[in-house]
Amino acid sequence: MELAALAKTRLMSMTEASCIFCKIVSREINTEFIAETNNTLAFRDIAPLANVHLLVIPKQHHRDVVELANNAPEILSEVLRTATDLAKKFTAGSFKLQFNTGAEAGQTVFHAHAHVLSDSAKDGS
């Protein structure tokens, strides 16, 4: 293996090893899941910015939604389906579906994830 490729692989492994969402996927961090598919997990945000604030993540590590779209569009599609299903279940109808890409855009966890946000929660959710 070429030195540059080896360095990139090692950096990627270290990033994944320290990624909080990867630790959630591997069950190293105990989290209450509200949905799980073959390729996604969903849970409530620990610092909600709305009455409903859910996160949907791919189980596979991708730094952001652009990397996910380029490398695994079928998994991105599953993230979107899961987010939409959860919005129907937990919101009264209107919601935001948001991806932050890059620190300047507000991304704080560098593992692709969708935010489902709504101020109108469905009764009982």
Residue ranges and their predicted role:
Residues 2-125:
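HIT superfamily nucleotide-processing domains
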